[in-house]
Amino acid sequence: MPFRILSLDGGGVRGIVAAKMLANIEKQINQPLNQYFDLIVGTSTGSIIAAGIATGRSCEDIVEFFQFKSSSIFPYESLFSLQRIPLLLKYGISAPKYSDNNLIQVLKGVFGETKLLDIGTSPRLLVVAYDTIERNPIIFKSWRPDKPYGNVPLWEVCVSSASAPTYFPAHKIDKRVIA
């Protein structure tokens, strides 16, 4: 029996393109993708899509997520928006383009208190982030209770992965700065 892997990368709101393609695949195979793939991997926006699929959401639901929530996650287009002043005061000239407050609230609303280990092995979920202080990748695995971060809420795993430098501030888990 083949071991099927789905790998999803970042791209901000362009994640809707991947979600629409996956919704089409889901229709074609007439099966939820969390039952079709053995391992789902994601980084940045791909981590949000991957976590959605791994927790049993349909790809149509994920498309709707992007349609209705992206404007609150990315609330303005210009670096010179007045909404950005608090970020500039906090971080100076290297301030990220967006605050992560809305991203956090939206993902908490989607994933609630679900922890990474709650997903388990069917399918396995792997999310990639980066420790900006230690300069090492952080690999979140849903199937490894012996590894760190298993009890981290899924929303926080996704925020860590989506905290791309220049777009969102780095996210801290256990005092480690992760982007």
Where are these regions (language model features)?
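Short secondary-structure junctions and interdomain/linker hinges
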Residues: 73, 114, 164-168
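Surface-exposed acidic, glycine-flexible loop patches that form ligand/cofactor-binding
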Residues: 29-34, 108-123
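Patatin-like phospholipase
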Residues: 2-7, 12-107, 141-147, 151-158
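Active-site gating loop/helix substructures
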Residues: 119-179
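Structural motif corresponding to the C-terminal cap of alpha-helices
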Residues: 25-29, 111, 162, 166
